[in-house]
Amino acid sequence: MNLKKLFFASALLFAACGTIQAQEVIAHRGFWTTDGSAQNSLAALVKADSIHCYGSEFDVWLTTDNQLVVNHDATFKGVTMQDATAKVCTAVQLDNGEQLPTLQQYLDKAKSLKTRLILELKAHKTPEQETRADRKSVV
């Protein structure tokens, strides 16, 4: 009886070991908790890649002139992303001195990096804005 239990436990352990996989790290808003970085900044994306993060999540808003900008908060430094133009949004200075990036700038920077991008399209005020943002974000 003990031999059966030992065999069963060994088989179970062997099966479990075969299914264990390495966990991958995804940087939330990039690697922004380091010097010279800020949430969703180009620097945060590059720094996430520099520490070999599997991916980097970032947030996207649609502006009134149908441009996509990268920022976490609906309103940041007095500018409400979905109620402003891209020109107004990108004039906002991030905490590391960078200008708030457009999605295109973010994608262009990512082309030379290995980290994967995880785009979070933020919830917009109206279904129409949601639909436009959805369509615009599909690259």
Placement of each model-derived feature along the sequence:
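Bacterial Sec-dependent N-terminal signal peptides
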Residues: 1-24
